[in-house]
């Protein structure tokens, strides 16, 4: 089987996507994937995405209404990643999971914590940027330096670290 393109959506009320028309970005990105690739697209809704007043619900009807031909996943993430060629998302942390599984990513935003390991343009979907283990380790190490416990915050350690 040819490998799949996995598109992972975010909940439309996520604060990370309030600076753009996420529905428009989602639709145009899915159409752009089809423009540059013949791969089957698997659409993965955020696991917490449920119908909510004032927000679009990303279901089969939503995709069909917008002329998007993608299969909606009902699998867990680990299963979705098994036959994956790449993962596309705006700035979801699922992109970190993908990198950890050795799967290339395309991030739609430079606000993604893993953007430095991302192919930047959908038009490059069939020519993805591949990173060395050393490059991946460096970025993941930088991310880990930004993780702090409540106790460390109480002691002011993050502030000492960043503002020394």
Where are the model-predicted features located?
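A nucleotide-sugar donor-handling region in carbohydrate enzymes
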Residues: 1-19
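Structural motif
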Residues: 4, 40, 85-86
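Short, solvent-exposed loop/turn segments at secondary-structure junctions
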Residues: 10-14, 47-50, 93-95, 111-114
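Short, solvent-exposed loop/turn segments at secondary-structure boundaries
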Residues: 17-21, 54-55
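Catalytic donor nucleotide-activated moiety binding site of glycosyltransferases and closely related
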Residues: 30-73
């Amino acid at each position: 089987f040819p490998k799949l393109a996995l598109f992972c959506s975010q909940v439309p009320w996520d604060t990370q996507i309030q600076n753009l028309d996420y529905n428009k970005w989602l639709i145009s990105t899915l159409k752009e994937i089809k423009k540059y690739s013949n791969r089957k697209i698997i659409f993965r809704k955020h696991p917490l995405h449920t119908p909510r007043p004032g927000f679009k619900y990303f279901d089969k009807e939503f995709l069909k209404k917008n002329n998007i031909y993608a299969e909606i996943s009902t699998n867990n993430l680990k299963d979705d990643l098994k036959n994956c060629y790449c993962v596309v998302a705006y700035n979801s942390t699922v992109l970190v999971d993908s990198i950890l599984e050795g799967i290339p990513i395309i991030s739609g935003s430079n606000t993604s914590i893993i953007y430095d390991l991302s192919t930047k343009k959908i038009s490059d979907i069939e020519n993805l940027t591949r990173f060395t283990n050393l490059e991946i380790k460096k970025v993941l190490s930088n991310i880990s330096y930004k993780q702090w416990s409540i106790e460390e915050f109480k002691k002011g350690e993050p502030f000492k670290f960043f503002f020394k």
